[in-house]
């Protein structure tokens, strides 16, 4: 049932992890506004009227479900996860639902946009007071080495990529064909790489004719290192575009990875090259306008990162990048937060506040404290 009906996922027995997928539908309102005859929306979030019941309001829940199920099948006792927001919420939620232990590391600069479906006291959460998402990744790796709970692995984890690739699986299932274009906002690049890899599987499978969907990927200015590198025609990003100070200027902190999988083999650069794709850079103002446009046309709220994708779609249409009648898949990576919070209680994210320079002894002390609290419950 749910996403587990797809046998291309690296999970054999997902017991105890019921997981619904995205809702994929043919747009009318936004399609009409943009002049697209074949615009399909993959909505990942909470929209009961459409049958979308992802209470974490993010497609990262598919990642978490597949990663946890895969780790459990392979005898992994627990995981350490770094996040700028959505991944933390997804792993915290499924950890509580399944009893599978995770330790989560997040940067304090992202807390204003973060929330859990459960109180943070139930999920060991470490808050980096003096760093960004990339610092959280570094600290999470150290927690992993000391605790023996493997680091979730980021984009290198095939279970993560296959989990995010569920969007393409559901889309092709709903559309009955491959999309000609795929639109998404990117931070680490994992979701875009997942869409590319899953599309390649469809072509190798032979049941779906056509070509690889052209990837149209977007970032939020002024922190848009991949977009800027791509527009320059470079495989390598400019270190100046990865400056941490730029992150404070964007509305989408979840897109703020300074370690994106761009120039590595099989990364975003290769995905764009293989698909004849393009990258776009979207300002905060353009993001806000696109968010309002989507809500007006489709009657549901979306998160800022998804609005970046909507803005990029508008740019692609204006540039004539999409042929008349070509099927377009817009990945709304998160939405329905306002609706969910009207119906369900959510919690601000808190936890142990630590420095990015915490000592190994300090990490050991925190882990011991977490073990004691868990054993007393």
Predicted regions and their residues:
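Short glycine/serine/threonine-rich phosphate/pyrophosphate-binding segments
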Residues: 61-65, 78-97, 112-114, 161, ...
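A glycine-rich, Thr/Ser-enriched phosphate-binding loop motif common to dinucleotide/cofactor-binding enzymes
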Residues: 50-66, 153-168, 303-307
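Small/polar-residue-rich loop-to-helix segments that shape phosphate-bearing ligand pockets
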Residues: 102-178, 244-269
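Positively charged, low-complexity intrinsically disordered leader regions
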Residues: 2-77
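Active-site/ligand-binding loops adjacent to catalytic centers
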Residues: 130-149, 201-301, 345-377
């Amino acid at each position: 049932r749910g996403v587990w009906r797809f046998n291309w996922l690296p999970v054999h027995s997902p017991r105890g992890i019921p997981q619904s997928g995205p809702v994929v539908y043919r747009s009318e309102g936004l399609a009409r506004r943009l002049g697209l005859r074949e615009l399909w929306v993959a909505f990942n979030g909470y929209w009961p009227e459409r049958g979308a019941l992802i209470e974490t309001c993010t497609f990262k829940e598919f990642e978490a479900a597949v990663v946890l199920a895969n780790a459990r099948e392979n005898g992994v006792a627990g995981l350490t996860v770094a996040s700028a927001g959505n991944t933390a919420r997804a792993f915290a939620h499924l950890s509580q639902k399944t009893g599978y232990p995770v330790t989560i590391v997040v940067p304090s600069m992202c807390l204003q946009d973060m929330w859990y479906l459960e109180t943070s006291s139930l999920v060991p959460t470490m808050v980096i007071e003096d760093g960004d998402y990339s610092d959280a990744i570094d600290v999470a790796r150290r927690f992993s080495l000391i605790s023996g709970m493997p680091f979730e692995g980021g984009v290198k984890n095939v279970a993560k990529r296959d989990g995010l690739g569920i969007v393409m699986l559901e889309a092709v299932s709903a559309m009955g064909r491959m999309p000609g274009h795929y639109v998404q906002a990117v931070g680490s690049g994992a979701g875009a790489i997942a869409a590319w890899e899953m599309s390649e599987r469809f072509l190798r499978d032979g049941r779906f004719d056509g070509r690889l969907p052209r990837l149209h990927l977007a970032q939020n200015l002024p922190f848009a290192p991949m977009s800027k590198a791509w527009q320059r025609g470079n495989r390598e990003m400019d270190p100046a575009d990865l400056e941490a100070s730029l992150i404070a200027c964007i509305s989408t902190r979840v897109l703020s990875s300074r370690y994106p999988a761009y120039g590595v083999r099989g990364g975003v650069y290769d995905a764009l090259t293989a698909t004849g794709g393009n990258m776009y850079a979207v300002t905060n103002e353009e993001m806000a306008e696109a968010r309002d446009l989507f809500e007006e046309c489709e009657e549901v709220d979306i998160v800022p990162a998804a609005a970046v994708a909507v803005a990029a779609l508008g740019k692609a249409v204006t540039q004539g990048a999409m042929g008349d009648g070509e099927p377009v898949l817009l990945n709304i990576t998160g939405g329905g937060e306002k609706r969910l919070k009207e119906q369900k209680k959510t919690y601000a994210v808190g936890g142990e506040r630590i420095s990015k320079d915490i000592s190994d002894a300090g990490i050991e002390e925190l882990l011991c404290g977490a073990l004691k609290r868990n054993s007393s419950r």
